Design a protein with these regions (language model features):
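Conserved kinase catalytic-core helix
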Residues: 46-60, 80-124, 128
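Short pocket-lining segment of the protein kinase catalytic domain that shapes the ATP-binding cleft
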Residues: 72-80
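Short, glycine/acidic-enriched loop or turn micro-motifs at the edges of active sites
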Residues: 78, 118, 135-137
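C-lobe/activation-segment region of protein kinase-like
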Residues: 111, 125-182
Length: 182
């Protein structure tokens, strides 16, 4: 068995109901993950690779755009997905994820990952990392706040909806970030 043995871990129809289906697959190789798209989008692809190399140096191992498709090889991040049932969803765990996402927003601003599902958060003891950066781009503050709240509710239930817009904890953070990065 060599490094090229793989198995398909996800297949997604990107735009269902269109003339032809745009499909993205994710393969788990022994040495890396590969996302493959059966279509091309150079306007997304090249800036996306550049952004990832800036925000997460070394995460992209290889990438290629052809006439018929595109693919990106990603470094394997050690640890378990936060969605793993071994993690107890107690207040300490919820607080740890909440604090990590806010820290990530601060770290990557003006970009925002915006796919903070537990399945995209990898925990390895005290280290926490994000995977699946496809939605990451420069975002408006309102969008970051809305997606943050939607993610926390999806991850932990409606009791974890955040505060009203006027006193949302991300507002002062985002305002401060936008002022310091001018």
């Amino acid at each position: 068995v060599d490094q090229y043995d793989d198995f398909l871990i996800q297949k997604v129809i990107v735009d269902p109901g269109q003339t032809w289906n745009k499909i993205r697959t994710v393969h788990n190789y022994k040495t890396h993950y590969r996302k493959h798209w059966n279509y091309t989008d150079p306007e997304w692809f090249y800036p996306h690779i550049e952004m990832l190399n800036k925000l997460r140096p070394g995460f992209v191992i290889n990438a290629r755009l052809t006439k018929k498709g595109m693919w990106i090889d990603y470094k394997v991040i050690p640890g378990q997905k936060a969605s793993d049932p071994d993690f107890v969803r107690d207040e300490q765990f919820i607080s740890r994820i909440y604090d990590f996402v806010i820290s990530n927003i601060k770290e990557t601003y003006p970009y925002a990952h915006c796919d903070w599902a537990l399945g995209n958060i990898i925990i390895d003891d005290t280290n926490i990392e994000l995977i699946d950066w496809d939605c990451c781009r420069i975002q408006k503050h309102e969008h970051i706040i809305r997606i943050f709240d939607e993610s926390m509710v999806k991850n932990f239930g409606p009791g974890h909806a955040n505060f009203k817009k006027s006193n949302h904890p991300l507002i002062p953070i985002l305002q401060s970030l936008s002022e310091t990065r001018r």
